[in-house]
């Protein structure tokens, strides 16, 4: 498969496998909103704030850790995602963008998360 044809969902699955294999305590976070109910019981549910990373939790040392997954070609951070990643890192946590499971593993190792 050509890199430009790899969707973000494949990257998310690869990173999820790395998280499971290493035992790091990160969970998948979905952002956005959806509607439940009908008529007068119809409600909008917001799942997470804009900029929340795809995986968030804590590393083996107890530090806050977040991974944002992007397609290898063409995946771009939103302003809210960039701000959140920068803010987490500035406050002593670990946050980064991964374009593959291999890249996520390398970043986790280099940053002392495992």
Which sequence ranges carry the predicted segments?
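Catalytic phosphate/metal-binding cores of nucleic-acid and nucleotide-processing enzymes, i.e., regions
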Residues: 1-114
């Amino acid at each position: 498969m050509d890199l430009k044809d790899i969707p973000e969902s494949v990257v998310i699955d690869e990173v999820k496998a790395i998280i499971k294999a290493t035992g790091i305590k990160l969970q998948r976070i979905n952002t956005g909103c959806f509607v439940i109910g009908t008529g007068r019981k119809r409600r909008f549910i917001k799942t997470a704030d804009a900029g929340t990373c795809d995986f968030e939790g804590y590393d083996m040392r107890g530090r806050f850790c977040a991974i944002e997954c992007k397609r290898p070609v063409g995946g771009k951070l939103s302003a809210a995602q960039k701000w959140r990643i920068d803010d987490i890192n500035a406050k002593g946590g670990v946050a980064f963008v991964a374009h593959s499971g291999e890249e996520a593993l390398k970043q986790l190792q280099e940053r002392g998360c495992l």
